[in-house]
Amino acid sequence: MCGIAGLIHRGKSSNVGSELQGMLQALKHRGEDSTGYALYGDTDGKNFIMRFKVGENVGEGSSSIMEDVSVYDERKKIVDQYLLELGVKIVKEERVLPYSLRYEISYDAKDLLEFSQKIESIPGVEILSMGKSLEVIKIGRAHV
């Protein structure tokens, strides 16, 4: 079960990151999937940002099974092959953690449902977010 918390600061500066971490730390007891951020970014609106994972965070008492990093690499190769088959161009690629990736992609969004279903048909792969301005970032515990 997840929980939702938010911040709005109007006309003043604040240490938003620290405040968000405090709220997320308070939600951490709800389980390994409870901790994340949703951020709006300033983009040109042309490309999609896809955040996805090819494995699980096995820390923090997770029930997930520890996998060798090579398993993540194999799943990533399959994702890349599927993207190629769908006519997607990877503009930028970041590996945030061994199991967590962020792609900026160029894609003529014919059918995002079909796109998502194809990518998530790969065992162990889950799209966390896909959009042109909002990113959902879920990479583990709230405490840094």
PLM features per residue range, with description:
Residues 1-141:
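N-terminal segments that mediate ammonia production and transfer
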